[in-house]
Regions:
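Extracytoplasmic cell-surface/polysaccharide-interacting catalytic and binding patches
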Residues: 1-78, 86-179
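Segments that shape or occlude catalytic/ligand-binding pockets
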Residues: 81
Length: 179
């Protein structure tokens, strides 16, 4: 059973947008957002929040990414309440792709995974001209296939371009190195 996270361990990221190179683009708060494949998940006034430990690592990683690459970290999703996960799983898209709920999972069952505890974050990045950095797929890419050979979001996808491979290599270790 997962441990319940105390409310005071969850903080909204928007408290830090003036002091850190982060931008918030809470995709699932806008059913018309071009990257939102699930429709209405959060209410329009939702705030992107996360566990204080993840928040610290994310902000430090954003500083390193900005200092070393000139990139701004774009935060797409983090704390996802059980009700929101349930709404995602009940969408026709997920119902048509039940394998997304099997290992390796694209989506966790309601209450499972890091999102309901604010311990998972979905990100993208922009360069100093606010241009999107190409990582090969949208931040939440749901392929019909989960294996590396057929899923462009997979870390070992063999057909990714050198630029995408390089961008992923730059972003990948930043959170770990921020600890």
């Amino acid at each position: 059973m997962l441990k319940i996270i105390p409310y005071d361990h969850i903080l909204p990221f928007d408290l830090f947008t003036d002091d850190f190179p982060i931008k918030i683009d809470l995709v699932y708060a806008n059913p018309d957002h071009p990257e939102n494949v699930f429709g209405k998940v959060y209410h329009p006034q939702a705030r992107l929040s996360g566990h204080i430990d993840l928040l610290k690592v994310t902000l430090l990683a954003a500083m390193r990414l900005y200092t070393q690459q000139g990139w701004t970290l774009v935060l797409k999703d983090c704390l996802r309440p059980v009700e929101a996960q349930t709404r995602m799983i009940e969408t026709p898209l997920v119902q048509a792709n039940p394998h997304w709920l099997e290992e390796p999972r694209f989506l966790s069952n309601p209450g499972g995974g890091g999102h309901p505890r604010g311990m998972a974050i979905d990100v993208a990045a922009q360069d100093h001209r606010a241009q999107h950095i190409d990582f090969g797929t949208a931040f939440d890419h749901f392929s019909s296939e989960t294996d590396a050979q057929h899923n462009p979001a997979h870390r070992l996808f063999p057909q990714m371009s050198d630029a995408v491979r390089s961008n992923r290599a730059i972003l990948g270790p930043r959170p770990i190195n921020a600890i």
